[in-house]
Amino acid sequence: MNKILDISHVYAGYDNNPRIIKDISFSVFRNDFLGIIGPNGGGKTTLLRTIMGLIKPTEGKITFYNDQDMSVSKINIGYLPQLNKIDQKFPITVHEVILSGLSMSRKLPAFTIPQRYKQRVEVVAEQMGVEKLLKRPIGELSGGQLQRVLLGRSIIDNPVLLILDEPISYVDKLFETNFYKILDEINERMAIILVSHDIGTILSTVRNVLCVNESAHYHCGTEISQDWLDKAYDSCPFEIVGHGAVPHRVLRKHQ
């Protein structure tokens, strides 16, 4: 299996805290489906921002690989942020939102959009089930509809890696099931990194698991033990409710 991303002993953070994540090492492979879990404040978002090049590591190395397994300076990455970070009052249509995913990697004409780009938008909209909403302003969409549109935006340029940050935190349970079916289809074409607080969802959806709590614990597969989770979450005790691929409950630190 070919690597697309290799992270080796990476430290990163911000001016007021340059070591939010510490000595993190793991790899992502082509068509991989990696789930990232961990307590709030553990560094999950910092890790994502570092992978996307928004934060520069203070130590360590991030290496990307092309189809020929040669190291390259970057790869095409799609990103779906948390839904609550999207301004639905912004005057833009569904078509324009999906199309904007192309403008991030190539310069689009200011006034006339080439037909091939319009066709690409239509293909992606149909894949997302929003083909009848292309002319609708995003302010008129439900949470589930908007998330489908944003997912379409993140994949329209055929990225090698798709990063999802808590993608279903603000949508209903009915949409959640359909959303993960869409991800399964997308995963046939690209690798996915999925961040979620829902351990049950992670275990039933992904192939491998990474727990980020300043440092990182990688687990190949999803048959993880309570001992492994205890070690991974460290100072954030929790309990697993039920059996198998089930939701978890995070508890306050024990005194």
Predicted regions and their residues:
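A short, flexible loop at the N-terminus of ABC-type nucleotide-binding domains that lies
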Residues: M1-D23, R30, D87
